[in-house]
């Protein structure tokens, strides 16, 4: 299996962020300690790390039968056209194709477990639902218990 296509993956992996993580609790504890890289700020970096995690999770979990994962910015034009996704790459974090050829969009949200995800506004879910209308499945991957 090839590595992450995420544009920040190489540097985050090189910094050994994912080393010595045995389960999701270890991952959440480590990410919450704050890891700032490339002057993006701690909150942006948390999101970057969670997006890389989600890409790997989708690729390796047999339940989803994923053929390929395309993070935002790496979705081939023919797939964006088929799903009618905007070319500004807004509203979704990526697309994954199943071994059956189904195209699914995904959105990654790293939040505290008790933080309510919002429907509208900045970082709301409404734009994800709106831009993903043509996807077979809209997949939300979140760390919050309050969706």
Please report, for each region that a protein language model flagged, where it lies by residue.
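Interdomain/boundary linker segments immediately adjacent to catalytic/signaling cores
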Residues: 1-62, 77
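Catalytic centers of nucleases
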Residues: 44-136, 140-146
């Amino acid at each position: 299996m090839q590595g992450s296509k995420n544009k920040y993956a190489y540097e985050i992996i090189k910094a050994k962020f994912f080393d010595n993580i045995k389960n999701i609790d270890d991952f959440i504890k480590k990410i919450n300690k704050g890891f700032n890289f490339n002057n993006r700020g701690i909150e942006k970096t948390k999101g970057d790390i969670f997006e890389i995690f989600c890409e790997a999770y989708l690729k390796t979990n047999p339940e989803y039968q994923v053929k390929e994962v395309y993070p935002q910015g790496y979705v081939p034009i023919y797939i964006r056209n088929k799903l009618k996704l905007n070319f500004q790459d807004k509203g979704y974090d990526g697309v994954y194709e199943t071994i059956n050829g189904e195209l699914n969009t995904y959105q990654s949200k790293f939040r505290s477990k008790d933080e309510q995800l919002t429907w509208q506004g900045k970082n709301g879910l409404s734009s994800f639902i709106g831009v993903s209308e043509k996807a077979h499945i809209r997949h939300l991957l979140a760390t919050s218990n309050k969706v």
